[in-house]
Curated annotation (Swiss-Prot):
GO terms for biological process, alphabetical: methylation
UniProt keyword Methyltransferase present: yes
InterPro entries in the record: Ppm1/Ppm2/Tcmp, SAM-dependent_MTases_sf, SAM_mthyl_Trfase_ML2640-like
Name the record gives this protein: Putative S-adenosyl-L-methionine-dependent methyltransferase Rv3767c
Enzyme class: transferase
Positions bound to S-adenosyl-L-methionine: D132, D161, L162
General function of this protein: Exhibits S-adenosyl-L-methionine-dependent methyltransferase activity.
């Protein structure tokens, strides 16, 4: 179903279901022979949600059934796992660096099923604010409570749609704009209209005192190339068709959830406002972690640019 200005979702619906796909990929990587990451909570989320297209990453029977129906699906499924593993490792390392730099205030925007508040070694005094749709945060909190999980930091949930006045809600929840913050916008911006993306980073910039950090992945060069998008959509249709036959449910079209619009170049925008910015393309990031996407699979994963930035202290 196409997006609307005021749409909302639970964890198995619309944008919420994409968080399950990401968690399933993290679970598959964690359980692999040579994992880049260790996320013991990812499998818990996937199992609690039941079967869906995300199950093809973690359910060997469903994966075998899908690849029997369409043998060409095995490669793009593995490529997506590699992508999510590298993405997760990159942002894990980012937060370890911010902690080493003395930042004790963390904001995870559209946190979905991010489990870093539970699994990273946060220094004493760290406060992690998670912002997302109310139903998504409730699913995560309830699922982890049922398994006796305890956050490794002070955790503050801020249930709000990022199209609303989230800075006001964040400060009401205890965020202190006079202190440095480590911001994360992972896997978020392509689900926002271009103007909403601009507003998001304007708000982050306004709330960031010197010593703050920011990390995000944003659409990379060629993201809107019509031929590339056509091939990617064809791959996704095949995956949805196989999943629908195996789990006997309607599988939503993820392409309907993205906003294919020209966007402000985030890295340049931040530099213009005094941030020290570094970037890495997806192939560069995968190579850093010993993974790659073969040429035949380049359309399975949209181009991404990974951005990390620091606001100078003087």
């Amino acid at each position: 179903m196409p997006r609307t200005d005021n749409d909302s979702w639970a964890i198995t619906e619309s944008v919420g279901a994409t968080a399950l796909g990401v968690a399933a990929a993290r679970a598959a990587e964690t359980e692999s022979d040579n994992p880049l990451i260790n996320d013991p909570f990812a499998r818990i989320f996937v199992d609690a949600a039941g079967d869906g297209i995300w199950s093809m990453y973690t359910n060997r029977t469903l994966l075998a059934g899908a690849t029997d129906l369409d043998p060409d699906l095995r490669a793009p499924i593995q490529q997506m796992i590699d992508f999510m593993a590298a993405r997760t490792a990159f942002f894990d390392e980012y937060f370890l660096a911010t902690a080493d730099a003395g930042v004790r205030q963390v904001v995870i925007l559209a946190s979905g099923l991010d489990s870093r508040a539970w699994r990273l070694p946060w220094p004493d005094g760290t406060v992690v604010y998670e912002l997302d749709q109310p139903k998504v945060l409730e699913f995560k909190s309830a699922t982890l409570r049922q398994h006796g999980a305890q956050p490794a930091s002070q955790l503050v949930n801020v249930p709000i749609d990022l199209r609303q006045d989230w800075p006001k809600a964040l400060q009401k929840a205890g965020f202190d704009p006079s202190k440095p913050c480590a911001w994360l916008a992972e896997g978020l911006v392509r689900y926002l209209p271009a103007r909403a993306q601009d507003l998001l980073f304007e708000r982050i910039d306004a709330l960031s005192r010197p010593g703050s950090w920011l990390a995000s992945n944003v659409p990379g060069a060629g993201f809107l190339d019509p031929e590339r998008m056509r091939r990617q959509r064809a791959d996704m249709r095949r995956m949805r068709a196989a999943a629908a036959k195996l789990v006997e449910t309607e599988i939503s079209d993820v392409d309907d959830l993205w906003y294919a619009e020209q966007r402000t170049a985030v890295a340049e925008w931040l530099r213009e406002r005094g941030w020290d910015v570094s970037t890495a393309t997806l192939p560069e990031l995968l190579a850093r972690y010993g993974r790659s996407i073969p040429h035949s699979g380049e359309d399975s994963i949209p181009p991404n640019l990974f951005v990390s930035a620091q606001r100078a202290t003087s």
